[in-house]
Structures are given as structure tokens and as C-alpha cells.
Amino acid sequence: MNDISTVNKLAERIGGSSCSTSCGDGEGSLQVALDPHIKITGAKVFAVYGKGGIGKSTTSSNLSAAFSRLGKRVLQICRDRGADATI
């Protein structure tokens, strides 16, 4: 999703804002905010798998970092031998 106009359209649809080079996350970054009315209780488990090279580790790492910044406790386990999610 490198097309900036596509990112802008997606951001408008989900109520976020897109960034160009003005955001710290880089060009094409999509910023969303957690709805304060939504209460997350209990553990949530997400499994991501599929074809190689499509951004699974990148997406998982970015989601983990975002939830952590929101004050959520996050445990990310990566079984990829390439260790792409290693920080």
C-alpha cells in the first residue's frame, strides 16, 4: 500500500489520518486512535500466517508497539526463523 492516495482514502474511511513526511512514522503511514468508549477486557489472541514477504512480521510488530504505547500489556511471539520481529 505505497500509494499515498490509497492511504488517504483508507484513513478517511476508518476515521484516522494519514501522514506524508510530516509524521515520525514515515511516508504512507496510517494513524488511528483508540476509541475511548471501547473497553477491552481479558486477553485477546491474534494469529497471523500466510504467504511469505507480505508484511506479517512488520504488521505484527507495529500493532504490538502501538498497543504498548496505549498502555496495553503485549506479548508477541514470533516463530519466524528470519527473526524479523526481534527488537
Curated annotation (Swiss-Prot):
Gene3D superfamilies: P-loop containing nucleotide triphosphate hydrolases. Its EC number is 1.3.7.7. Its cofactor is [4Fe-4S] cluster. GO terms for molecular function: ATP binding; metal ion binding; oxidoreductase activity. Pathway: Porphyrin-containing compound metabolism; bacteriochlorophyll biosynthesis (light-independent). Binds 1 [4Fe-4S] cluster per dimer. It catalyses: chlorophyllide a + oxidized 2[4Fe-4S]-[ferredoxin] + 2 ADP + 2 phosphate = protochlorophyllide a + reduced 2[4Fe-4S]-[ferredoxin] + 2 ATP + 2 H2O. ATP binds at residues 53-58. GO terms for biological process: light-independent bacteriochlorophyll biosynthetic process; photosynthesis. Mg(2+) binds at residue 57. InterPro entries: NifH/frxC (IPR000392), P-loop_NTPase (IPR027417). It comes from the Bacteria. Keywords: ATP-binding, Bacteriochlorophyll biosynthesis, Chlorophyll biosynthesis, Magnesium, Metal-binding, Nucleotide-binding, Oxidoreductase, Photosynthesis. Homodimer. Protochlorophyllide reductase is composed of three subunits; BchL, BchN and BchB. PANTHER family: LIGHT-INDEPENDENT PROTOCHLOROPHYLLIDE REDUCTASE IRON-SULFUR ATP-BINDING PROTEIN (PTHR42864:SF2). Component of the dark-operative protochlorophyllide reductase (DPOR) that uses Mg-ATP and reduced ferredoxin to reduce ring D of protochlorophyllide (Pchlide) to form chlorophyllide a (Chlide). This reaction is light-independent. The L component serves as a unique electron donor to the NB-component of the complex, and binds Mg-ATP. Belongs to the NifH/BchL/ChlL family. This is Light-independent protochlorophyllide reductase iron-sulfur ATP-binding protein. The gene is bchL.
